[in-house]
Curated annotation (Swiss-Prot):
Keywords: Amino-acid biosynthesis, Cytoplasm, Diaminopimelate biosynthesis, Lyase, Lysine biosynthesis, Schiff base
Compartment annotation: Cytoplasm
Catalytic activity: L-aspartate 4-semialdehyde + pyruvate = (2S,4S)-4-hydroxy-2,3,4,5-tetrahydrodipicolinate + H2O + H(+)
Functional pathway: Amino-acid biosynthesis; L-lysine biosynthesis via DAP pathway; (S)-tetrahydrodipicolinate from L-aspartate: step 3/4
Name of the featured protein: 4-hydroxy-tetrahydrodipicolinate synthase
A Gene Ontology BP annotation from the UniProt entry: diaminopimelate biosynthetic process
Organism: Legionella pneumophila subsp. pneumophila (strain Philadelphia 1 / ATCC 33152 / DSM 7513)
Summary of subunit composition and partner proteins: Homotetramer; dimer of dimers.
Top-level EC class: lyase
A GO CC term assigned to this protein in UniProt: cytosol
Binding-site residues for pyruvate, renumbered to this chain: 44, 202
Amino acid sequence: MFSGSIVALVTPMRNDSVDVHHLRELVEFHIAKGTHALVAAGTTGEAGTLSHSEKLLVIKTVIEQAKERVPVIAGTAMNATKDCIELTQQAMEYGAHAALIMTPAYIKPTQEGLYLHYSHIAQSVAIPIILYNVPGRTACDMLPETVARLAKISNIIGIKEATGQMTRLQQILRLCEGSIDVYSGDDLTAAQWLLAGAKGVISVTANVAAKLMAKMCDLAMDDDQAGCLRIQEQLMPLHELLFVESNPIPVKWAMNKMGLIGGELRLPMTELSEKHHQALEKVLKNLELI
């Protein structure tokens, strides 16, 4: 249903409010660069510090600006199942093509709790759902066996798996037997995952190197292994520097350098440490992004 380079959009801020003007411009930027789909109000979009109404504003703005030219996937993760259902229903009413739902953070549910959380959501909304496993940020790891159980639910259609572990991809593909699409959630290993059967990548790097990420995914889908890996090698210094501090700190700094957004973050996120400025600027210049 969704494939290729799927950007995890940042949320531009101005005076501690959502910068709708620059958010609309980002949608146009990605469509022009060939990005295949957009994620609104996800982790990279600072969803953890957005209010409920701000999340809806971001989702609605991206959907309206995209005008059906590319699919829009709404980040609707909430820790409480009932709250997640409510937000997902609202995103569906705005016209989101799917919902990306991260595992609950901090509360550390059991595997059965995860199964019940997602199955209740899926039964309550008529929209495709993409699971999202990122244990490095949530302290919650959804195991492949749980994914396989959830894959039997008709509107659970994919998983963003951010561990970057090739064995995890192989386990999910084997257990789910094609009943669910897998998306890389780790830019550093995305090319290898694409060539091993992942459907796409939900990418931080695509915020900056949109055209190259889209090309890398196109080459992978065309089974051009050499071409795909060549672009991945070219992008590796950027991938690494975009995670020298917590996402989206580095990517917002880079986008500010590129003139795409103002670069403002919401506390407790802070600006990129000065010690990383020179290296990231050099990589952006090497890639002819500034």
